[in-house]
Regions:
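Membrane-interface segments of envelope glycosyltransferases acting on lipid-linked substrates or membrane lipids
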Residues: 1-375
């Protein structure tokens, strides 16, 4: 039995947290046992506990990658728990604590991809960053080739990195009556075509460009609704933008929702407008699980997930006109739309299930532990 402690510093539910819950749900409990360290009052806690895992809370380090007090708390926990593996997710405090405690196997997952500052891609910053990461982590997981590229360009040795593409659980299907009721409650007419996006409302997710695209689409296709699922710091600004564009009656903001499944079930076309931090997008794979084709930007790991004309289309990032044209192309060619739906489901089954992802990580865990035992 391998004892694993996962560490996150997030208090909200982002991609890293959702990914961890998928791992926990799919681990082979005859091989893997573990606990999760979170900052106090994290929204992730009930979801992790629902999977049967204990959550250990720290008083410090809320939404901070590094916090000295949090690091000391984590050190005390690790000394008590004595795990075989510590696996950190955007939590430098945990990474450093695991090293200082002498935990034999220290995993770190890179969940994002974004332009790196010059000081980290040139001498001496590149060499120093590579040395720090190689010392603190024995094994590194990148959730997309784009994330791996981010790491190698900042000095992290390629041999340390394994790419495991994000997988997701199959979205729960709702009944036609449930779908009709939700559409009605949101004011969506029976014949409306629903374009949807599920993402935190942050600048780098590209919602402002989506609203510009929506304005263009609605000029010729007024029976279209844009469903924006999620909450975030840009919510009020985006609502103002929708009003300024005169499309507020055709744009629905749900705010943060605990269960996105009912919303996926009323979406016709899945959208991803990211221009920063995107790797392998869970919202895309979740949508594919119920046959939702997608229009996505070419940023980060999106090109690995979307194959042109098979399960969707790709457009340049920050290009509202290109996004609008792609949406219209799908809406106006229903035969192609039906083919894309079939392609989306097929691709999910072949590449993007949570079970496939988890088996890959379990194998890495076993190999890392066995490697350490031989030393």
């Amino acid at each position: 039995m391998i004892k694993v402690i996962n560490i996150l510093s997030d208090t909200n539910i982002g991609g890293a947290g959702r990914l961890l819950v998928n791992y926990l749900r799919n681990f082979d409990r005859s091989k893997i046992e573990g606990k999760v360290i979170l900052p106090k009052d994290s929204q992730l806690k009930p979801y992790i506990e629902a999977e049967g895992y204990e959550v250990i809370e720290t008083e410090h380090g809320r939404d901070k990658s590094f916090d000295m007090k949090a690091m000391r708390e984590i050190q005390a926990i690790l000394k008590r728990e004595k795990p075989d593996i510590v696996h950190t997710h955007s939590a430098f405090s945990g990474k450093l604590a695991a090293f200082l405690c002498g935990v034999p196997v220290r995993f770190y997952t890179r969940h994002s991809a974004f332009p790196q500052p010059k000081k980290l891609t040139t001498f001496p910053g590149k060499q120093l960053n590579g040395l720090i990461n190689s010392t603190l982590a024995t094994d590194i997981v990148a959730v997309a080739e784009a994330a791996k590229d981010n790491l190698t360009e900042t000095g992290v040795p390629e041999k340390k990195i394994t790419v495991i593409i994000n997988g997701s659980e199959e979205v729960r299907r709702t009944t036609p009556d449930e779908q009709k009721a939700l559409r009605s409650s949101l004011g969506i007419a029976e014949g409306d075509f629903v374009c949807g996006i599920s993402a935190r409302l942050e600048d780098y997710k590209g919602h402002s460009y989506l609203l510009e695209s929506a304005s263009e689409v609605l000029r010729t296709h007024p029976d279209t609704v844009f469903l924006i699922v999620g909450g975030g710091s840009q919510e009020e600004a985006l609502k103002r933008q929708a009003c300024e564009l005169g499309i507020e009656k055709k744009v629905i903001f749900t705010g943060f929702v605990h269960d996105v499944a009912p919303y996926y079930n009323i979406i016709d076309l899945n959208l991803n407008c990211s221009w920063g931090t995107e790797t392998s997008c869970l919202a895309l794979s979740e949508g594919m699980s119920i046959g939702l084709p997608a229009i996505a930007t070419t940023y980060g790991g999106n090109p690995y997930m979307i194959t042109e004309g098979v399960n969707g289309y790709l457009v340049p990032e920050k290009d509202a006109h290109a996004m609008a044209e792609a949406i219209l192309k799908v809406m106006d060619d229903r035969e192609d739309f039906e083919k894309l739906k079939i392609g989306a489901r097929k691709m999910y089954e072949e590449k993007f299930t949570a079970a496939v992802m988890t088996r890959q990580l379990e194998k890495l865990y076993e190999e890392a532990v066995n490697r350490r035992k031989k030393k």
